[in-house]
Amino acid sequence: MLDRDVGPTPMYPPTYLEPGIGRHTPYGNQTDYRIFELNKRLQNWTEECDNLWWDAFTTEFFEDDAMLTITFCLEDGPKRYTIGRTLIPRYFRSIFEGGATELYYVLKHPKESFHNNFVSLDCDQCTMVTQHGKPMFTQVCVEGRLYLEFMFDDMMRIKTWHFSIRQHRELIPRSILAMHAQDPQMLDQLSKNITRCGLSNSTLNYLRLCVILEPMQELMSRHKTYSLSPRDCLKTCLFQKWQRMVAPPAEPARQAPSKRRKRKMSGGSTMSSGGGNTNNSNSKKKSPASTFALSSQVPDVMVVGEPTLMGGEFGDEDERLITRLENTQFDAANGIDDEDSFNNSPALGANSPWNSKPPSSQESKSENPTSQASQ
């Protein structure tokens, strides 16, 4: 964001560059020039100007969704009024209806700031000047802070207008005071203000009315668009507002569980668990390696799959998984059912004690008396 002091409001064509400013943008000094154009258009006002003229004025200088805010302090406390695009034309018109014959804005040392899609103009020393011809010629100077946001496009229209009034002064020419110096009643009338905080009664009454009109803009727009009765428009708006209030908050998108990658064994062959441990293996958490067969693998080998961390998320699924591989030839249940195959195993020698059958119960009984007699 770039801030700079652009000086007082220029009164020259846009092709003329102010000395000392080296900024080269496609818009030149466009924000100041837009205020100059706004003042020039307001000077063209006549009493014959109707609603169409004011609507064209607002369309030229304000966005369709523009908001205008006025803040000031009266005897009964601070006031703040915010109106939308539909009510902005009537606001400027109310100033002239209150007795003003001329309106323009003077900016001293405004600061221009560039943002993504708009340009802001902040002037802490802004003066709104109005000329009044009735009941006596009076110049009203309203001092305050003006903050504007212009859309950064070819039209450079105002999106936000915020004028905060601090004080005001009402100036009367000395010649008029000299003319009525001998008239006490006239002097007493001249000493009274014709505005409140720089705003006429016509403008103040309109701003108070906007407190009611602004919320009704949705009803009026719906009535004009759908040709509904005022009661139906109110019911529809209230129902939609109620739906927005009771609508459940949108649930955050749940993240799909990451699929565990299959881990291949070093030999690339498959292994399967024994049939005797089917129930136990189902109750435990299996890894993909537990479904591999052991037909072509070296027997009695414990294989541990390496965890895959690249491309995955850290968590429980990234822990090292150790799978116990059961060899069917050492299964106790299989050994009981297939005793002959166990005894005829080539791993056992001919003189192995495992090949001799245990003596029967009758032979053991006949040997016992002999052993006792020898003793």
Swiss-Prot record:
Pfam families: LID, LIM_bind
One GO MF term attached to the UniProt entry: protein homodimerization activity
PTM entry text: Undergoes rnf12-mediated ubiquitin-proteasome-dependent degradation.
Highest taxon of the lineage: Eukaryota
GO BP terms in the entry: negative regulation of transcription by RNA polymerase II; nervous system development; positive regulation of DNA-templated transcription; positive regulation of transcription by RNA polymerase II
GO cellular component: nucleus; transcription regulator complex
Region (Disordered): 248-294, 331-375
InterPro entries reported in the protein's UniProt record: LID (IPR041363), LIM-bd/SEUSS (IPR029005)
UniProtKB keywords: Developmental protein, Nucleus
Localization terms from the record: Nucleus
Limits of the LIM interaction domain (LID) domain: 300-339
Composition skew (Low complexity), residue ranges: 266-282
Tissue distribution of the protein: Ubiquitously expressed in the early gastrula before localizing to the dorsal region of the vegetal hemisphere, which contains the Spemann organizer. Expressed in the CNS, pronephros and tail bud in neurula and tail-bud stage embryos. Expressed in multiple adult tissues including brain, heart, lung, stomach, intestine, liver, spleen, kidney, ovary, muscle and skin.
Subunit structure, interactors included: Forms homodimers and heterodimers. Interacts with the LIM domain of LIM/homeobox factor lhx1/lim1, and with lhx3/lim3 and lhx5/lim5. Activates lhx1/lim1 by binding. The stoichiometry of lhx1/lim1 and ldb1 is important for their function and an excess of ldb1 can inhibit lhx1/lim1 function. When bound to lhx1/lim1, escapes degradation by rnf12. The N-terminus interacts with the N-terminal region of rnf12.
PANTHER family, alphabetized: LIM DOMAIN-BINDING PROTEIN
Family membership: Belongs to the LDB family.
Note on domains (UniProt): The dimerization domain is located in the N-terminus.
Protein purpose: Binds to the LIM domain of a wide variety of LIM domain-containing transcription factors. Acts as a coactivator together with otx2 to stimulate lhx1/lim1-mediated activation of the gsc promoter in the Spemann organizer. Acts synergistically with lhx1/lim1 and ssbp in axis formation.
Protein's name according to its UniProt entry: LIM domain-binding protein 1
